[in-house]
Amino acid sequence: MFMHSLGISVYPDKSDIKEVYEYMETAAKLGFSRIFTCFLSIPDDKRESYLKEFKGFMDKAHELGFVVAADTNPEVFKLIGATPDNLKPFADLGLDIIRLDGNFGTQGDISVTRNPYGIKIEFNASMDAGVDLLIKNGGNKDQIIMCHNFF
């Protein structure tokens, strides 16, 4: 079975948030249901305000019916206090899908797929992510998504 959905890329920290919300509203009216965004550039000196703004963005996305995937990496995990065994900081933000730009090794990648929050973990299908090995060794296949690069 294949899952198809239309999506948009949105970068709320790089654009006027009012324009971003208008774009999201238009896309929702046209039947788009997925947003891809980047969650890689969290300024350390403005972390709290950035996370508050991102949470507002997530709330608006969900209000409009979007599922949101955010590109992130192990460095961001550390910055917001998340670990492969603890995705609560991402759950608190309302993230639906974490697209891993990098990995935590086999055991860490297995752990991240077994999170209790229902957050899907998206691996890059353009690279050999070794997903078959993850599943064979206990990764939760119901929380694994594969997606090719958007460019």
Where would I find each of the regions flagged by the language model?
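Short, acidic/polar
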Residues: 15-28, 78-89, 127-135
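Active-site mouth loops of central-metabolism enzymes
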Residues: 2-22, 69-82, 122-124
